[in-house]
């Protein structure tokens, strides 16, 4: 399991306090749906409307950002705290690679948001955090 340093935890918590959670999450979802179209296969209820401004994307963004907020609140217990969520994702057949792809699109959004201050150190912290989340969400898969 990925472990974040104290500095990385501090950075992740600071970023989460600074950004508009729902907006950045909706943008990351839009980007993952556009760049990796196969990730939309479980979102037929969105009827092909995958823009960050579309209501279905906004609703899913709300769920994702709440889960990320919970992870950030207790970074030492992400895997334990995501056990139920991991099980739900396994039941509906979410490909575990999608979690990694969403993490990548979040990093793109962070780089766009922070432009000059998203340097290698910050990128590494974000990368490790989203890897931690992806591993935790994949933990109940057999």
Swiss-Prot record:
Database matches in PROSITE patterns: GLOBIN
Expressing tissues: Red blood cells.
Family under the similarity heading: Belongs to the globin family.
Molecular function GO terms recorded: haptoglobin binding; heme binding; metal ion binding; organic acid binding; oxygen binding; oxygen carrier activity; peroxidase activity
Assembly description: Heterotetramer of two alpha chains and two beta chains.
Gene Ontology biological process terms from the UniProt entry: hydrogen peroxide catabolic process
UniProt keyword list: Heme, Iron, Metal-binding, Oxygen transport, Transport
Function noted in UniProt: Involved in oxygen transport from gills to the various peripheral tissues.
Gene it is expressed from: HBB
Gene3D superfamilies noted in UniProt: Globins (1.10.490.10)
Protein name, as recorded: Hemoglobin subunit beta
One cellular component term from this protein's GO annotations in UniProt: hemoglobin complex
Family annotation (PANTHER family): HEMOGLOBIN FAMILY MEMBER
Top-level taxon of origin: Eukaryota
Organism: Hemitrygon akajei (Red stingray)
Domain Globin, chain residue ranges per copy: 3-142
Disulphide connectivity of cysteines: none
Annotated heme b binding sites: 60, 89
